[in-house]
């Protein structure tokens, strides 16, 4: 069994605004609350935030919806992110804006749309949470999910301390205590996550006050290396919006999506270059 080290993070902020939005496409009203991003068979995949249909939307790299996939035996209480491995898509239904959810889960769905394999549920809780009273400053909300090795890694959204805590859960169906393995001092609130195994690159999106948005990168990220990490933080040159998802293309190029906000008439798909 592989040993998973407690990850220790050193906050070394390298902040710049030199990146550019290289491409910018409007998204359909059907996905106006886009809140996750993946790539499968050269198609981008997204889903809506809370209250939408329990569906995945497959779209071109110009943002056109080409296919809608309804997720059977699932509901969308507050889907926040998705990730994948070689065989499955994992959808994080763990939005917890008011601190009171006791039904946090991740849906495990075959990548193959024609598969007869049934969808499965990975339920979890934060073992440190001892109160479920409504609290807008909850530290048990999350918007980031990645697949890494044989685990799923959840990034919490701590509004009070502007940090993210990292929790591991298995990829197998069942009910689990999520295992806290580290804290990342990002001085902001995490809104999306992605990991590229080949590049060993972790990428996050974040905000401070929903007026400024950032892209965060950490190189050589691994669960099996006990080390300190350098955190690179780049301001995204975008007006007030709500950046919700990220997908790595290369070390210097990323797809991001933003929700439909009052300052725009539509959600957006953007390609950003550092």
Name these PLM-found stretches.
Residues 1-22:
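Bacterial Sec-dependent N-terminal signal peptides
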Residues 19-274:
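Sequence/structural signature of beta-propeller domains
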């Amino acid at each position: 069994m592989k040993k998973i080290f407690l990850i220790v993070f050193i906050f070394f902020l390298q902040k710049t605004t030199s990146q550019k939005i290289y491409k910018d496409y409007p998204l359909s009203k059907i996905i106006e609350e886009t809140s996750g991003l993946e790539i499968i068979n050269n198609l981008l995949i997204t889903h809506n935030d809370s209250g939408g249909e329990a569906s995945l939307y497959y779209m071109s790299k110009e943002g056109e919806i080409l296919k809608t996939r309804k997720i059977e035996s699932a509901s969308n209480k507050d889907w926040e992110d998705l990730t994948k491995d070689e065989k499955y898509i994992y959808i994080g239904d763990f939005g917890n804006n008011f601190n009171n959810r006791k039904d946090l889960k991740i849906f495990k769905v075959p990548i193959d749309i024609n598969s007869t394999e049934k969808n499965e549920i990975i339920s979890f809780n934060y073992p440190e949470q001892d109160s479920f009273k409504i609290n807008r400053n909850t530290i048990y909300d999350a918007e980031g999910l990645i697949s890494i090795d044989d685990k799923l890694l959840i990034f919490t959204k701590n509004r009070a301390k502007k940090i993210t805590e990292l929790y591991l859960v298995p990829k197998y169906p069942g009910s689990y205590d999520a295992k806290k393995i580290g804290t990342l001092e990002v001085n902001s609130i995490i809104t999306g996550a992605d990991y590229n195994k080949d590049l060993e690159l972790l990428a996050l999106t974040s905000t401070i006050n929903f007026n400024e948005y950032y892209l965060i990168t950490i190189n050589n990220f691994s669960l099996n290396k006990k080390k300190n990490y350098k955190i690179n933080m780049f301001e995204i040159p975008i007006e007030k919006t709500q950046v919700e998802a990220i997908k790595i293309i290369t070390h210097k190029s990323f797809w991001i999506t933003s929700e439909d906000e009052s300052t725009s008439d539509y959600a957006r798909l953007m390609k950003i270059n550092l």
